[in-house]
Every structure is written in structure tokens, then in C-alpha cells.
Amino acid sequence: MVAIDDADISREKAALRKSVIARRNEMNPAVRAQKSAAICREVVEQLETTFGQAGSASGKQPLVGLFSALGSEVDLRYVVRHAQHVGWRIALPVMVLQEEAPGYTMLFVDVDYKTALLRQEAFLAKPAKNLEPSDFDFERFPLVSPDELDALVMPLVAFDSQGGRLGYGGGNYDRYLPQLRENCWVSGVAFDEQCVPRVPRAGFDLTIPQVIHA
């Protein structure tokens, strides 16, 4: 019975994913850019408040996990430019084959501002691209452990008002979120057009503390 329920949930997710991505793709590019800017401003405001409350006595630069937009996702380059202005470090995800884990694993690596803004590297131009360890320059882009992140901004396919979130189906963030520190600031970002009445949820699906949307 459980297997049937899980299969039903998977089918429901797939249908919702296809529908919402199509709706997001149909947004006017100018409107999408305006909304991305509004979302980024709110992200920056909340991060400034969070990092200000944490204090800067240690002189440690906050490390913020972001993402390079895939297709019609929210464009976070405004946040990157602000990070450059105030001195926050940024980390971005890359999909790399790991010997100790089956398949490809989402890792975060330290990325310089110029590279993040230009998005010419393969793992930024095509964020879903799977890479072999030998194909990735870990010396140029050092690995960041989850407990190093002070904040994480996540992409979403769909979300609801109860904390439900729908991704692309790989479970990457479901596996990554439990590895973060308890005091790591976490938020999803999405357009209002991606909000749905209810995101189908299986037992292993994690909710998200908040979604910044416009």
C-alpha cells in the first residue's frame, strides 16, 4: 500500500513540476527580471539583519550559499554583486560523482564574484550538468563543507504556504539541508507564479523555513 501511495505522490509531483515550470517559462522576461530584483533585495535585507545580529567581532566573512539560475529560475546575481560590495563570500553548487556515494552528489564550492557573475564555467552555465571529479578544478573552486555555510538560498520549482517545496526530483537539497548548522539562515526563492495550494509531500520530503517571493 505504501509503495502505491509513493508512486501516486511521484506522479502528482511530476505533473505539478511540468505545469509550474511551463508557467514560469511563460513569464515575460522583463517581468521576471523585475521580480528577481525585488526578491534579491529582500534576500539582501534579511541577510544583512541576520549577519548584523550575529555580530562581526570575529572579523569572519559570512559565507552565503547561492545558485546559478537554471532556465527561468530567479536570477541571484544582484545578491552576488551586493556580496562583492560588502565582502560576503559566496558558494555555488556543482554536481560531482563521489566514490563514497551512489551517483552524483551536490557539493558547494567557493566561487569568486567575477566567475559567479559571468556564469561561463560549465557548472554555472549548465547547473544540472554532472561532472567527473577529474573534470572539476577543486584548487580554483575549493570545496565548502555544509557546516561552513552561514546562509543558504535555494531554488524552487513550486511552493505552498505550509512550507512545502518541490524541486526537480533529485533530492539534492533534501540530502543537503540536514547537514547545515542549526543556526544557518535558509530560504527558498521563487516567483508568485510558482505558488500552489498544496505541494505533494512524501515522508522523506523536508519543509522549508520560508520562501521569499514576488
PLM region descriptions:
Residues 1-11, 15, 22-25, 134-152, ...:
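Surface-exposed, charge/polar-rich loops and edge strands
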Residues 67, 155, 214:
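Conserved residues at the C-terminal ends of beta-strands
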Residues 75-81, 163-177:
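Short Gly/Thr/Asp-enriched flexible loops that form oxyanion-binding sites at enzyme active sites
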Residues 2-144:
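N-terminal active-site beta-alpha-beta segment that forms phosphate/nucleotide-binding
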